[in-house]
Each structure stands twice: as structure tokens, then as C-alpha cells.
Amino acid sequence: MHKFFPRSGFFDFETVRILGTACYGGADVAEVLEAVGEIKSDDAASWEEAWRRQSWWAEALADQAREGGDREAARRAYLRASNYARASGYMYVSDLGAEGGNAPPTQDPRALPVAEKVGRLFRKALALMEGEVRALSIPCGAQALPGLLYLPPPGKRIPGRDKIPVLVFLGGADSCQEELYYLYPAAGPGLGYAVLTFDGPGQGIVLRKHGLRVRPDWEVVTSSVLDYLEAYSAQHPGLELDMKAIAVSGASMGGYYALRSAVDRRVKACVSIDPFYDMWDFGTAHVSPLFISAWTSGIISSGFVDKLMTVVSRLWFQMKWEIALTGTLFGLSSPSQILLNMKNYTLSGKSDGSRANGKKSHSPTDGGGVESDSFLSEVRCPVFLSGAGKSLYLDVDSHTRRCYDGLTGVAAKDKELWVPESEGQGSLQAKMGALALCNQKTFQFLDKVLGVQRVPLDVSAHI
């Protein structure tokens, strides 16, 4: 496939991520190509400037269309302005302080203003949507999580069905709910589904404004969301939400969250797009096992690991960005502590970080290669699971297939595995560049397991 940045797989992937939203109004092809022409490979400053300029231009077009009464043009331009603004701040790097320091990272001072601008522009687009969108405030511990409930237009309700099935869409490590729109919220309401999104701990405005850190036990977060949704549905019976047809979904780290959330018996279906099985295994995948063993056994100090990763990150922007992002999510500045904290994010059931000598967690098994203590054995609902054959981050065998094999409590007929091998068919991480196809696969699965019946379309020519 064509490479926008042949020398930077990271910048290339993130460009496809932006361009891929064009099918749902998040980008325009020529605008993206114009921005690409102004960006230097692995140069965060030129990336920020190019997308900031495109956001400004799209916002000006949106205001012109709004003044002229052109609803569709205004909506699409506000979407692009919001998405380009999000992209402009994507390469910001938090300050981790001194090597191996214990103080939480200091986020780039531009990060919060950009996040607020993204939300402001996106809300203008929401006001011009065909279907109703409701703003929610979801209690979760001491913090209220901002959410959005996308409802199908009356004419798009599923024929013959009294109530509306609900898909709860969970964001991932670097997501905000404004970007989540370009997958399920962009397609679900038109198919008769309500779609709920929210910024949870470590995500979007909740992270940037309130500093709420990520947590591994996302089933607790989703449980709070479902509690709220049940109460909200009871308070608003006219919405006709079907509390017996709730599905959860997510991509990448959101796919991990979705699988953890699927243990809640209120969840009747789960869609997990390109999840990791174990974050520690992901984080150490390209490091020598001997080095990891020497470190975790104390032969090599954490201070040495910190110094080594700091030096490498000065030479490799992608690593610098990844360490800063993960440190911001965890509230940690030491690269070694960031890596060790990844052990808590696992589906193996070993969230106590007890793996000895840094060995990969492929055992113990039940004798057939399936981890007998897997958290996934608690899942009972049907699951649609995908992997990405050309992922920049995750190996299919180390993550996707382990997730599939770990679903021992789900009958084979209720598990679907989709692992495309070409980019056009969805082989990039989180199905970037193939969002419409991901929607098609997802809602076909949900229709099947939630009992949604659709009449085949008549495409015979009547012209």
C-alpha cells in the first residue's frame, strides 16, 4: 500500500487514521494531502502546524455554510475542523521530568486548550445531526464522565422491533469520544441502534482537564455506565431503549476494555476489535527475553533501564511519544515503572504482577494451549473478535488468537474471528482506513446475535 511517510511507519499510520474518517465526514482527501505535503517525517512541530491550519480553514468553511443555511456542508465542515484540531495535538509529548523521577508527568500546556476546542467544534456538528444526540453525565466513583447517546432518527428504527438495541462503545488508550464518532456512532443510528460513548479514566477531556488516570479493571467503569443507562432508560421510557439488548465494543485498548466488560451479565454481545491480551507482553515484545529476565531478576537495575530508554527515545520519536503517552495515562514518569505497571493490564487473570523473571504469560494451560486461569473464561455472551495482520503494534498469534482461545465459556458457534491480511480489508490496527467495513462486519454480527431481522434490498433497476 502507498506510504505517505516511507521513513516513519508511525506518521504514516496516523495519517491513514485521519484520512480513513473521510467516509463519515471527518476528513476531505485534498485537505489531508495538503497537510501531508507540509509535514516532515517524525517532526511533531510540522505535524501540529499543518493540522492546525486545516482545522482553521475547515472551521471557516463551516461558519460560512452555517450562515448560508447549508446544514450538510456546515455539519461536515465542523466535523473536519474538530478532527483536524484533534490531530494537531496528537503528537504533543508530556514532560516526564528527570530520568527515573517519581513525579507524575506534566502534560503539554497546549493539550487541554486543544481538547476543549475539539469538543467545542464537535458539539456544533452534533447540533446539525439528523438524529437526536443527548449529552450525559455518568457518575463513576467521585468523577462524572461526559457521555453522548446517539439515537436513531424515527425513520431509521428497526421495523417490527418495539425497542432500540444499545451499543456501548469504549475508547482506547489515546482516544477521545469525539474521534469515536467516526466508527459506530456514524453508522449505528442509521441501522436502528442507539450508540453510547463516553470519556472514561485516562481518556479525552477527563484526562486532560481532570487528570483522572487509566485503570485496568474497566469492567468496574462499564458497570457504572450500565447502572446509569438503566436508570436513565427508566426515567425516559419514551426513548424505548432495549435494556435486554445491550452490546459493548472497543478497538485496540478499547477492545481489551470490551472483553473485560463482557463479564457483566447485562451485556448480551461483545465486539472486540484488535485487542491486546497482555500489555506487558505487548510492551516487551521487541526486547530481548534475556534482557528482560536480567532486569526483572535484579541483575540490571531499573535506573539503567530508565537511562537506556531515555537515550533511545531521544533518537526515535515514536518511542518518545509512546513512553510519554503511557506515562501520562498511568501518572508515572519512570520508563521502567511504566513498563512494570503494564503487567496489571492483562486478560490472563494474573493482574497482581506476579510473573516471575519477566517470562511471557503463556502458561499455565489446561493442556490444550488455553490458559486455564484466563479472565476471559468468565465471559458468556457471543463475541466478535478481530485481529490486524499488518498491525504496527500487536501480533495476531500473541494477542488475537490467545483472546479467542481464552473464551472457553463461549460456545464455538457464538465466537467469530476476523483476521484480514490486506490494508483495504482491515489489516491495520483498529481497522484504520477500513472503518466502513468494520461497521458492516460489526452490525451484521450484532443483528445476528440480538435477533434483528432485515429484509434484503431490491437493487433491480427502475430507471
UniProtKB/Swiss-Prot annotation:
Pathway: Mycotoxin biosynthesis. Its EC number is 3.7.1.-. It comes from the Eukaryota. InterPro entries: AB_hydrolase_1, AB_hydrolase_fold, FrsA_esterase. Gene3D superfamilies: acylaminoacyl peptidase (1.20.1440.110), alpha/beta hydrolase (3.40.50.1820). Residues 350-373 are annotated as: Disordered. Keywords: Hydrolase. Pfam families: Abhydrolase_6. The active site is at S252. SUPFAM superfamilies: alpha/beta-Hydrolases. One of its GO terms (molecular function) is hydrolase activity. The keyword Isomerase does not apply. Signal peptide: none annotated. Homodimer. Belongs to the AB hydrolase superfamily. FUS2 hydrolase family. Hydrolyase; part of the gene cluster that mediates the biosynthesis of the mycotoxin pyrichalasin H, a tyrosine-derived cytochalasan that inhibits the growth of rice seedlings, but also inhibits lymphocyte capping and actin polymerization and alters cell morphology. Pyrichalasin H is indicated as the responsible agent for the genus-specific pathogenicity of M.grisea toward crabgrass. The first step in the pathway is catalyzed by the O-methyltransferase pyiA which methylates free tyrosine to generate the precursor O-methyltyrosine. This is Hydrolase pyiE. The gene is pyiE.
